[in-house]
Amino acid sequence: FPHLGACLDEAQLLGHGRRMLEAVGVAVRHMDHLRAALSPLADLHGQVLRVDPANFPLLIQCFQVLLASHLQDEFTVEMQAAWDKFLTGVAVVLTEKYR
Amino acid sequence: MVHFTAEEKAIITSLWAKVNVEETGGEALGRLLVVYPWTQRFFDNFGNLSSASAIMGNPKVKAHGKKVLSSLGEAVTHMDDLKDAFAHLSELHCDRLHVDPENFRLLGNVLVIVLAHHFGREFTPQVQAAWKKLMSAVAIALGHKYH
């Protein structure tokens, strides 16, 4: 995130985080057609941003830590299994156009 | 070798003091087996693993989870010499159990999520960072004797 600079500006961080979460929302609404729904984002990540694919599991982990700590009891084992499977599927689609 | 600052050590030990080793161990191992079903291959003799509730309620899963988490307690008291502390377990996992080291990373990640689940808001980014660092270091120590 070079555009955020060395000192992370909170507003920018929250803004960027919000954009990412909205994209997750798109994925949630198109779970059976992830490839089609996320195609523009797959192009962006693969050809423009070229985010290291290794970073996706890191973000997925952080996302689940957040869900677990905020939802607590609601974050059952079934919920964890479903979200892990779903987010991993999203990451696969986002990294499909790297080559 | 991984170096832990005084602050990281304090964060880790103070959280560990509040962890119920028996329950948390079973929870973490259970979640690993449910979320990553292929890990069940190491536990053929554990009986009923046919559903999430069967796994989470399975007494062998709970017992083994407690054993695994107790070893992690060793890590908390040996943060400065993890390689030595886990040398024997590393040999065991390689030579006898044939567990791919990737599984240590998976379990470490699941444990971090279980801790977040239990501690809620107390599990801040700093706490997460310290624990993630410990889990990564333990995974490395456990893989050290692999050949």
Curated annotation (Swiss-Prot), chain B:
Tell me what this protein is called. Hemoglobin subunit gamma
What sections of the protein cross the membrane?
Answer: none
Metal-binding found in the keyword field:
yes
Q: Which tissues is this protein detected in according to the database?
A: Red blood cells.
Q: Which Gene3D superfamilies match?
A: Globins
PANTHER family named in the record: HEMOGLOBIN FAMILY MEMBER, HEMOGLOBIN SUBUNIT EPSILON-2
Write the record's keywords in alphabetical order, separated by commas. Heme, Iron, Metal-binding, Oxygen transport, Transport
> Which InterPro entries does this one have?
Globin, Globin-like_sf, Globin/Proto, Hemoglobin_b, Hemoglobin_oxygen_transport
- Entry similarity comment: Belongs to the globin family.
Give the protein's function. Answer: Gamma chains make up the fetal hemoglobin F, in combination with alpha chains.
How does this protein assemble? Heterotetramer of two alpha chains and two gamma chains in fetal hemoglobin (Hb F).
- GO BP annotations, alphabetical order: hydrogen peroxide catabolic process
Q: Could you name the Gene Ontology cellular component terms for this entry?
A: blood microparticle; haptoglobin-hemoglobin complex; hemoglobin complex
Give the Gene Ontology MF terms in alphabetical order: haptoglobin binding; heme binding; hemoglobin alpha binding; metal ion binding; organic acid binding; oxygen binding; oxygen carrier activity; peroxidase activity
Task: Give me the residues that bind heme b, please.
Answer: H64, H93
Give start and end of each Globin domain: 3-147
The superkingdom of the source organism is Eukaryota
